[in-house]
Swiss-Prot record:
Gene Ontology CC annotation, any one: perinuclear region of cytoplasm
Annotated region described as Disordered, given as residue ranges: 1-24
Name the UniProt record assigns to this protein: Cyclin-dependent kinase inhibitor 3
Catalytic reaction annotation: O-phospho-L-tyrosyl-[protein] + H2O = L-tyrosyl-[protein] + phosphate; O-phospho-L-seryl-[protein] + H2O = L-seryl-[protein] + phosphate; O-phospho-L-threonyl-[protein] + H2O = L-threonyl-[protein] + phosphate
Native species: Rattus norvegicus (Rat)
Amino acid sequence: MKPPISIQASEFDSSDEEPADDEQTPIQISWLPLSRVNCSQFLGLCALPGCKFKDVRRNIQKDTEELKSSGIQDVFVFCTRGELSKYRVPNLLDLYQQYGIVTHHHPIPDGGTPDIGSCWEIMEELATCLKNNRKTLIHCYGGLGRSCLVAACLLLYLSDSISPQQAIDSLRDVRGSGAIQTIKQYNYLHEFRDKLAAYLSSRDSLSRSVSR
């Protein structure tokens, strides 16, 4: 019988180690002012807290504590559960709830768009949070594609006076030129109002026919 092989600690891949507290920068939250859509609140956007992927090595506990200390009361998560596992934060939604942060999970595929019914639900939930003066944060993986799309849709939802391009510009002012990442997302935003109006009209028609 061969003796067990002795493995030195230095032989292990150390890439999974948590970064030391002084190595990790605070999680960066961008605050989108909603004053131009007649709302005094700000909407927070950020990248995925606790993410461990490629050269990103964040500490999930530390990030969540920072969100809580920032006063975040509601968080909207657009990552799929598969993504949360891939980026090593499979229990993120549970952790938010443990910290007393109300969690709204609306998974949208990376680079994709929500169906209009789901988007309307997100708009209603966001509008309710903001109306009740709750400090609200939204995020996907990078905080640029899906999150910025939803935030831009919210601007169009809250005001008829803002154009799709103005909404995109507002997001790029706070998140940089990478906001709204795909042609699909760009087109979705430009068609959002018409599609939402058609969806709500058909929904009302169905409701009336059922109530007869």
